[in-house]
Amino acid sequence: MAKDIRVRYAPSPTGLLHIGNARTALFNYLYARHHGGTFIIRIEDTDRKRHVEDGERSQLDNLRWLGIDWDESPETHENYRQSERLPLYQKYIDQLLAEGKAYKSYVTEEELAAERERQEAAGETPRYINEFLGMTEEEKAAYIAEREAAGIIPTVRLAVNESGIYKWHDIVKGDIEFEGGNIGGDWVIQKRDGYPTYNFAVVVDDHDMQISHVIRGDDHIANTPKQLMVYEALGWEAPEFGHMTLITNSETGKKLSKRDTNTLQFIEDYRKKGYLPEAVFNFIALLGWNPGGEDEIFSREELIKLFDENRLSKSPAAFDQKKLDWMSNDYIKHADFDKVFALCKPFLEEAGRLTDKAEKLVELYKPQMTAAEEIVPLTDLFFEDFPELTAAEKEVMAGETVPTVLEAFKAKLEAMSDDEFVTENIFSQIKAVQKETGIKGKNLFMPIRIAVSGEMHGPELPETIFLLGREKSIKHIDQVLATL
C-alpha cells in the first residue's frame, strides 16, 4: 500500500463497550497491525446529554482486557477528545461561512417539526427547505435581524450541491453512490450550543489526524455522502471507506438488539463472568470476516498475520452465543492451569469454597467450563446436599442390576483403608466390581456416577469420588439405595 496506514476507533463515552463497537475496534486494530500502520483511539464526546461518567475509562479498560492496544490516544496525546477540539472546528466553520459554502440558519425546532409534519401528511419525503429561498438581500437581512432580536440562536448549515454525485469504492461493499438531492437538503454542521455535528467533526478529525482508512459499521453508510460533501467543501482528499455488515441474532435472524436480553452483548459482561479474553477476541474477529479454511481457533498473532480486508463479508454476521461458549471452553481446556485457577478464585472465595481442595476441583472441572463463574454450580456436589434426581436419572436407577452394582461398590469402598483411598485404586475397585458381577459398560459406570454425584455426566469418576471423600461417597450411595 502506497500511503501510510492510519486507522481509528472513535467511541462515544455513552456507556459500556458493546460487542458491535468492540468488533469495529478489533478490525481496525487488525488492519493496522497487519499493514504495519497506526491504530488511534479518539473520543467523540460532543453529545453532552448522553455522556456517561467513566464512560471513556470503561471503553479503554475493556479494550485492554480484550488484548487490543493502540499507538495514539487521549492518554498520550493532547486534543484527542472532540470536546478539546472546538476551536479547530470553529476555524473551519468560519472558513465555510466566509466562502459562502455554509450559512447561519434561524429556523426554529418548532418550525422544522411543523414543516416535517406537513411534508409527511402530503406524502413527501421530509427535507429541509432553505428558509431564505426567494428572498432578496434586503428581505434576508431583515429576517435575520428580526430573528436575532427575538433571541433565536442560529445553527450553521452546509449548502448542499443538489446536483452533485457522491460516490466511493467501499472496501467491503464495492461501489456506492448517492445523489446530493437525496440527502435531505442543507444540513446542520454546527448546533445552537456551538458544538459541531457528528458528520462535520468527524471529517475535521480524520483529516487532521491523517486517517487513511475508515472502517466502521454499515449503519454509517448514510453518513458517508454528507462527510464527502464536507471533504469537497474544504478541498480535502477523503480517506477510503469500508462498511462492515450488521451483526444479527443467530436465533431470530434480526439485527442484534440491546433488548435481546438472552445474549451477552457487552464486553464487561464477559469480564465479570470470567471468560478468557483471548476467546472473546477470537470470536469477535470472526464476526463478518473469514480467513478461509476450516480452522476457527486463532491466536491474536495469527489473526494479525491472516487479516485481509478483502475477506470482510458482505453478508450479515450472526452472533451465535453457543459458538462463543464452545470457543471459550476450548480456550479454557487448553489454558495454563494457573491462569484458569486465578479466574476461578474470586468466585470460589465469594461462595466460601476456597478450601484446600479448591485447586483440585478447578483441575477436575476445567475441561467442562465455559467461564470461570461456572466453577460454583459445578462444585455444588462437594458443598451442598445430594441433589434430587431427574426423571432420566431415576429411569437409569430403576435398572434391574443397579442394586447389585451399588452394594458391591459400596463394599469395596468400605474395605479400603485411608491410604488405599486414592484415584488409581478407586478405578481398580470399579473394575473389580465388573469382574465379580459380570456387569459392565453403562450398566456399571452410570449407576455409580449417579449414586455418587447425582448426575449422569461429569468429569472423571474416580477423581470425583476421591475429592468427594470415602465417607460422603458411601453416604450418597446409601441415600440412593434407600430409594430403590
Swiss-Prot record:
EC number: 6.1.1.17
Chain ranges for the short sequence motif 'KMSKS' region as given in the UniProt record: 255-259
Keywords: Aminoacyl-tRNA synthetase, ATP-binding, Cytoplasm, Ligase, Nucleotide-binding, Protein biosynthesis
UniProt keyword Aminoacyl-tRNA synthetase, yes or no: yes
Reaction equation(s) it catalyzes: tRNA(Glu) + L-glutamate + ATP = L-glutamyl-tRNA(Glu) + AMP + diphosphate
Chief location: cytoplasm
GO biological process terms held by the UniProt record: glutamyl-tRNA aminoacylation
Residue span of motif 'HIGH' region: 11-21
InterPro entries given in the database record: aa-tRNA-synth_I_cd-bd, aa-tRNA-synth_I_codon-bd_sub2, aa-tRNA-synth_I_CS, aa_tRNA-synth_I_cd-bd_sf, Glu-tRNA-ligase_bac/mito, Glu/Gln-tRNA-synth, Glu/Gln-tRNA-synth_Ib_cat-dom, GluQ/Sye
GO molecular function: ATP binding; glutamate-tRNA ligase activity; tRNA binding; zinc ion binding
GO CC aspect terms: cytosol
Key word Hydrolase present: no
Pfam family, one: tRNA-synt_1c
Location(s) in or outside the cell: Cytoplasm
Annotated binding of ATP, by residue: K258
Domain of life according to the entry: Bacteria
Subunit composition and interactions: Monomer.
Family in the record: Belongs to the class-I aminoacyl-tRNA synthetase family. Glutamate--tRNA ligase type 1 subfamily.
Reported function: Catalyzes the attachment of glutamate to tRNA(Glu) in a two-step reaction: glutamate is first activated by ATP to form Glu-AMP and then transferred to the acceptor end of tRNA(Glu).
Protein name per the record: Glutamate--tRNA ligase
